[in-house]
């Protein structure tokens, strides 16, 4: 018995030593300095300056890019410069923590991929030092992997999505459970939108520093009883002998049963597609064809379209009208005020209050107006006047929405985009300072 235990311990120790002694061959090590001229001059998403380098595959390349001077993101882009079509970004290492000129990316003998400033300050790493890594590469599906001598992945970019999922990439219960939008095309920090894999559904949320909790504004439906999603994968599935479809495929952790929601059917190769939560709060699927030239990209799915018959047009996106506005069929066409509906432009904003004292403000009413928050958030059951009283007592409440048919109430901590419905049972009330004309509840 002692011999067996000793043998097992020796075997385990030998495996550990072999793994810990594995080193990256000199020819596979690299140190890249973020300096010199720019390398990619094709149309590039977000219109940045780009420096590309190894590793790369036929359709993917690792790059430094910046949309503001001296603030670089380490990212993977998809596209081929030969096609003269837009290059797009599908993965980022250091969103919100940009590096400067002369920053370094190092893949050394110990197998750790390290992004550091010129002075040596660590910005990002894969935490793969001394874990048996022997190489790094980008697979044909866009997954950048660090692997050991047996080919097993020690680290993979697919485990850390930002706002994008490539085909075969997942949100996972025991890993990254959400995508987060970037703030804008020119500002690469986290934006207010997130796509979250919850226990039984996939939900779009809107969050700002004014909202007490994230506000759901869209849900993907799965018409099967689910216990708990273990993962949610953007997947290409064979639709027929000649076509492929793109789906979001969930795996139930209890039954291991797969459920999916269909997204699109690209006319070209579906495997070079990605789904992204855009900075504008919409979700789009982009499909890339290596056969095309200047029209290599197709948007094959959009969550919010102006042709949507289910009420999910662009007016349901919280900041579609930027700061404030009344919207219909995707068009922001009025700026609500206590003087009536004024013409809308980008300067439209909800009224500002100088005080929380109810004596200093009033409400103006918008008949037939709805909010992005009402469809997927239950609200509370109460009377219209009680709903108003609740908002009046809450200093952070900017207005409220009421459904007279269902007697449901929603308090608005962010008003943003309102939808013009033509349904008089839906009414919005907005707080305004008393210096202006007063409307009553």
UniProtKB/Swiss-Prot annotation:
Phosphorylated on tyrosine. Residues 1-22 form the signal peptide. GO terms for molecular function: carbohydrate binding; glycosaminoglycan binding. Induction: Up-regulated by fungal elicitor. Up-regulated in both heat- and senescence-induced programmed cell death (PCD). Its main location: secreted. One of its GO terms (biological process) is cellular response to hypoxia. It comes from the Eukaryota. WD repeats lie at residues 254-296. Glycans are attached at residues 102, 258, 269. The keyword Disulfide bond applies. Disulfide bonds join 387-409, 391-397. Residues 356-433 form the PAN domain. GO terms for cellular component: apoplast; Golgi apparatus; mitochondrion; plant-type vacuole; secretory vesicle. Residues 29-159 form the Bulb-type lectin domain. Keywords: Cell wall, Disulfide bond, Glycoprotein, Lectin, Phosphoprotein, Secreted, Signal, WD repeat. It is found in: Secreted, Cell wall. InterPro entries: Bulb-type_lectin_dom (IPR001480), Bulb-type_lectin_dom_sf (IPR036426), G-type_lectin_kinases/EP1-like (IPR051343), Pan_app (IPR003609), SLSG/EP1 (IPR035446). May be involved in a cell-to cell programmed cell death (PCD) signaling mechanism. This is EP1-like glycoprotein 3. It comes from Arabidopsis thaliana (Mouse-ear cress). The lineage of its organism: Eukaryota, Viridiplantae, Streptophyta, Embryophyta, Tracheophyta.
